[in-house]
Amino acid sequence: MRALLSVTDKTKIEKLAKDLCDLGVELISTGGTYQTIKEADLDVIEIEKLTNFPEILEGRVKTLSPYVHGGILYKRDNNSHLATVKELNIKPIDIVVVNLYDFQKALDGGNPEEIIENIDIGCLLYTSDAADEL
């Protein structure tokens, strides 16, 4: 089993990551979340290792990849999906742990550039993908 962790608010993320590791879950993570988990001396895979593509545009693009979204979205009971992910070597992502940027805080600040920077497309996509699999 694998989990993707990408959080803005890292409160207690080390504990959650440790608990997941103790359950035998393989952790995948992005940027600052990856660093926090790594500093807690836990095994974690950096998202770039999964996507085979570096984080670009100051972190704006880091996980938009079939290796991420395909791993979340494929239907585990669909033979066509199973054949596709096997052929493309896409591994399942079974758990998604995210929290969104504080958009309301940015909106209240009124700075248009800050507002745009706080539109969290990546975590919204993870949330949508994971919800599709419920």
Where are the regions a protein language model picked out?
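Short beta-strand scaffold positions
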Residues: 28-29, 121
